[in-house]
Curated annotation (Swiss-Prot):
Main location: cytoplasm
Single GO BP term: regulation of translation
Chain's role: Sequence-specific RNA-binding protein that regulates translation and mRNA stability by binding the 3'-UTR of target mRNAs.
Disordered: region residues: 26-46, 77-114
Localisation per UniProt entry: Cytoplasm; Nucleus
Swiss-Prot/TrEMBL domain comment: The pumilio repeats mediate the association with RNA by packing together to form a right-handed superhelix that approximates a half donut. The number as well as the specific sequence of the repeats determine the specificity for target mRNAs.
Descriptive protein name: Pumilio homolog 14
Pumilio repeats: 206-235, 236-271, 275-313, 314-348, 349-387, 388-423, 424-459, 460-494
Domain PUM-HD, residue spans: 178-518
GO cellular component, one term: nucleus
GO MF annotation, one: RNA binding
SUPFAM superfamilies cross-referenced by the UniProt entry: ARM repeat
Composition skew (Low complexity), residue ranges: 29-44
Amino acid sequence: MDKNFRVNTNDERNIWLSTAVNENLTMASSSSQPQPISSPFHQPENQVNRVNPGSHYYDLETLESSFGGLSFNDSSVGQNGDSIHLPRRTNQVFTGSSSGGAGDDNGYLLPPMGSHHHRELEELQRHNYLNQLRMSYQNDYAHQSYWYNTDGDGNGMLNNGFLNDVPSSSRDRVSDYYTNRFGYEGYNYWRGNEGFDYNQCQASFSAFAKDKEMSERLGMSIFQGTKETVDAIYNGLIGDICELMVDPYGSDVVQLLMRRCSSEQIVQLVDIVTQQMFQFVNICIDSLGTNAIQVLLTCINERAKDQIPRIVDVVRTVALQLSKSNHAIFVILACFRLFPLHCRLLLELIVQNCHQIAIDQHGCCLLQLCFNKDRVPNLEIRQRLIMEAIANALRLCLNCYGNYVVQYIVELNNRYLIDALVRQLIGNYAHLARNKYGSHAVQKLLKLRWIDSRVIVIDLLREIDTLLLDPFGNYVIQTAWFVSKDDVRRMLRYHIERNIPMMRCNKFGNKVLEKLNI
């Protein structure tokens, strides 16, 4: 067969055609006079074969008529390279309306009614119709062309079915993508033409919750469903609740579910989540899991208050681990915000380890958030933590993270707290000014307009000779110059002019002279 001659058909048609060819070969071999088999694809120009049911040419004519409904790459080229002229036809579906081998209006010759080939053709039509209907349902699912009501009313099935203009290749992609996606038999209940059956799908709820599309539908069922619906979903998810809390899609489903849970179900959730401490910590330090735990704390505060001491004690046990995570610190904050009367032991633990927490990258953020009244409304908790930070101010100012805690206290603009901080650091300002991190805290204190900067400047003058030449201290002296007035500035000028010869030989000293125009 010529390489340019290619049949573009489906596997079902190939089966029917191969059957016809085999029967034709059998009849030809049983004939009394052997003769070569004629090719059904080659027809001399202007030649018309009459249909004679009594000869083997009838089967050849039938086979040729069936191929007339197929498309070819080049219909003008025969097997032997000869040109043939056939009527221009497009792919059409056999209707079976003609009978007895008579041709229809388009020149098709169909098998006679009741013949073996006619039964094959009817079966092919039925198979193609069911296959098209199945792909139509799958296309509806892919484009969300359905509506669903969790209360039981509504059709719960796919309604679109408009696939007449969709290419076969597009339909196949839809079918391939959505076929047995998770390997769960229950998954088909979400895509079928029947309503959602919770009993049948209960074993696959976890798989649904982890899928993007299915989790949205599951969340809508939780949000709009009845108590029986919520209970069914709860029973299907409770076994994998810890895993779902840290899942990209399952976490949202769990949070919606917890907001609909009863007090007994909340208690059961607490039992499971706190059963193993390392698992609880892993959930808290996860970016998604921490949100789920915070929702659980909110639900405990609303519907299971008897569980408050228990959950706070669990958080206290692992508080130091949680304070070192940028996600888990919000669990501690949630306890301070929701359960201020039950957090005495937790507060004492944070206070006792204030320095250790403050010099941690994420612990310093925890303390700053605890100082914020919007985050921790309870004044007693805030004051206790702030005063403990002030007591450790000197060591904190020298740390790359701890100095941010001290600076945040300054930014609170509370005179009582700032006066306490200034007094706490007296005698150490020169030492802090020579430190990379401490110099920032000293400069921030000097810039406060409503405090008496004289106390800080006098402390700096004790070591002015070294500060003028120090990589960090020179910036503190420049700040002190601009914020000081009258007699304090005159004292600074005196010491600066006294050190001009030495400052001229040092790049940091020159910076001071250039900045002050001296």
